[in-house]
């Protein structure tokens, strides 16, 4: 999945977005280490699975690793980021791992201001109960996974796409689901036009045969539909 990389260190490994990634990487057989600011049940679980997890942040934790995985929340002055740059270690964003999963599967990516986690979870459970053995990456804990992700052997994957920092534009799924678009994450996008343009770009990542399943009740989604030439399947409660 990640050519030439074996030892991977995740900063903030216990966070809601990172824990799903860590679980996938451990199950894929990578030599995983990580760091976080406090002990937790999920950190204990990762240790039981064979990962090395440190409490606190220290430049020594990245010695000998092939790559660092971070989220946008990790500051540039984090000592592990600083050390990785000094040593020329590859620094990946968590979205790069999500992309790597999508690139080798028939990927379904779910985005939107509200309902991403629930929708991703429901699609994942449908595939699990249909014995499709999917790979699932969610931003929250769900009962049927006993966590927030699972590594399947089937050809489907379903992931929660994070539009908050624009990193969802790295993804190239075969199917996109958009629950709604609202004036959210303005700290990153600054204007509603920028947010809408990002969603247009996201839909344009679909291959020609790809489909976008969207809530047709949402005015902003209808705007995206008017801008992008892709196949849309709409759902909603309104008569139109």
Which stretches of residues belong to each language-model region?
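A short, basic/flexible loop-to-alpha-helix module at the beginning of a structural domain
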Residues: 1-5, 58, 98-100
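ATP-dependent carboxylate-amine ligase
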Residues: 1-52, 64, 68, 86-89, ...
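Phosphate-binding loop of NTP-binding sites
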Residues: 24-30, 47, 61, 72-231
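Residues in the short beta-alpha loop(s) of Rossmann-like NAD(P)-binding domains
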Residues: 36-38, 140, 217-218, 238
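Short acidic-hydrophobic, aromatic-tinged amphipathic segments that line or gate anion-handling sites
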Residues: 53-56, 92
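Short, conserved beta-strand segments within well-ordered enzyme catalytic domains
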Residues: 54, 69, 213
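Short, glycine-/polar-rich solvent-exposed loops and beta-turns at beta-strand/coil boundaries
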Residues: 61-62, 240
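Short, intrinsically disordered, charge-balanced linker/junction segments flanking boundaries
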Residues: 130, 233-240
């Amino acid at each position: 999945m990640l050519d030439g990389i074996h030892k991977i260190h995740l900063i903030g490994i216990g966070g809601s977005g990172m824990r799903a990634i860590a679980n996938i990487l451990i199950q894929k057989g990578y030599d995983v280490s990580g760091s976080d600011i406090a002990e937790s049940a999920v950190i204990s679980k990762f240790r039981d699975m064979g990962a090395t997890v440190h409490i606190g942040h220290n430049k020594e934790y990245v010695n000998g690793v092939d790559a660092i995985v971070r989220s946008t929340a990790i500051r540039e002055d984090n000592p592990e980021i600083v050390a990785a740059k000094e040593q020329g270690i590859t620094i990946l964003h968590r979205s790069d791992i999500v992309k790597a999963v999508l690139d080798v599967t028939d990927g379904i990516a779910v985005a939107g201001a509200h309902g991403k986690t629930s929708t991703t979870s429901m699609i994942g459970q449908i595939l699990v109960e249909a014995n499709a053995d999917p790979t699932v990456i969610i931003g929250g804990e769900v009962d049927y996974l006993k966590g927030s992700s699972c590594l399947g052997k089937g050809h489907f994957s379903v992931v929660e796409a994070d539009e908050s920092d624009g990193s969802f534009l790295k993804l190239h799924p075969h199917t996109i689901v958009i629950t709604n678009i609202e004036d959210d994450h303005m700290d990153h996008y600054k204007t509603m036009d920028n947010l809408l343009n990002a969603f247009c770009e996201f839909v344009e990542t679909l291959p020609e045969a790809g489909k976008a399943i969207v809530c047709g009740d949402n005015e902003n989604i209808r705007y995206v539909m008017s801008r992008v030439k892709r196949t849309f399947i709409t759902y909603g409660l309104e008569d139109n």
